[in-house]
Amino acid sequence: MGKEKVHINIVVIGHVDSGKSTTTGHLIYKLGGIDKRVIERFEKEAAEMNKRSFKYAWVLDKLKAERERGITIDIALWKFETTKYYCTVIDAPGHRDFIKNMITGTSQADCAVLIIDSTTGGFEAGISKDGQTREHALLAFTLGVKQMICCCNKMDATTPKYSKARYDEIVKEVSSYLKKVGYNPDKIPFVPISGFEGDNMIERSTNLDWYKGPTLLEALDQIQEPKRPSDKPLRLPLQDVYKIGGIGTVPVGRVETGILKPGMVVTFGPTGLTTEVKSVEMHHEALQEALPGDNVGFNVKNVAVKDLKRGIVASNSKDDPAKEAANFTSQVIIMNHPGQIGNGYAPVLDCHTSHIAVKFAEILTKIDRRSGKELEKEPKFLKNGDAGFVKMIPTKPMVVETFSAYPPLGRFAVRDMRQTVAVGVIKSVEKKDPSGAKVTKSAAKKGGK
């Protein structure tokens, strides 16, 4: 057995008709763990419905439909393998909740694959003011997705077909936009592909022999290996809490940073409740240590289920334990709010697993969202497209961290009127010291608080 491949998460972004589903479907289809029988079934159904052209996207549509109906889809279907990596595709963003998911992040993407429609009119629609190409790229950068691959898709449908001139034009325009967002376009491969015909997806295409760079598969292999934050202090936001007969209270969540081990004394923020971890399990197997990215359940001593809930964060009591945030200052980008946002605005913040109303106590500055330069001190309001620094006060106890120290706990979506109105990253946090929090006997014995 060779060394196991590294897992990476990829988010596929781009305008609605750019061919995201077809391209992703193609990769999963050719490189993924989809059972041949399943594919044959899909193909047969697609043929019966005269959807031949939709073959790859159809695979993805079927998966999405099954997932949305709550059929537990074998998540291997959203995975594919390159020579170097196991890749998982994070929610493809046709989804209304995509932005929220990308931020509250069931997983942080290591690389964004930006799909561009190269056809006449298609490219212009995607990159226009209202197109999603810009918004997705800006979001990816703001949320810390540092690496990007650009695919100039539908090269089989340019005029003339496989046009180098069209490719050059797109590379030039997209590069200048990505540079404004904050990416370095010299570090981004621009791969001309056809997600439908398969040109340059996996093998080199003779139709594009003027192009000398990597295929999409090779570009994915050139992604820099992500550093997992296991050396940081523990942060594990709870997703759920169960009471299991004969075992007791079992909180469940994903280790975002640090390491969780049996015998560790953990402090839950914002309450300050401190106790010992008896055991840690993943997929019904006992673990000696859980690392970032692991979804685990862990059993805690002498803690009632009612004392824990979703949004609470487990941390190591001896290593920068999680505390309640009295207030925090964030850099916010207003994305889709119909009016003006002024001091006193109180929407809901989705940050890690918590979902709490927060007051915009004070808009400190308005800034240029690309350069970060200050445009105005203490503006009266922010509106669509504006960015600014805002001091926020939670309406209930909550744990947040700075984006620089603990990225998954330092980015958030602002929700109002059933949509994401803004996104942000946290720059500084003023924390409260817990007073009178319960410390269980076993924790006290171990020299906890």
From Swiss-Prot:
Molecular function, one GO term: GTPase activity
Q: Which InterPro entries match?
A: EFTu-like_2 (IPR004161), G_TR_CS (IPR031157), GTP-eEF1A_C (IPR054696), P-loop_NTPase (IPR027417), T_Tr_GTP-bd_dom (IPR000795), TRAFAC_GTPase_members (IPR050100), Transl_B-barrel_sf (IPR009000), Transl_elong_EF1A/Init_IF2_C (IPR009001)
Q: Could you give one GO CC term from the UniProt record?
A: cytoplasm
Extract the ranges annotated as region (G4). 153-156
Stretches the record annotates as G5: 194-196
Coiled-coil ranges per the record? none
Q: Where is this region: G2?
A: 70-74
The name under which this protein is listed is Elongation factor 1-alpha
Q: Which gene encodes it?
A: EF1
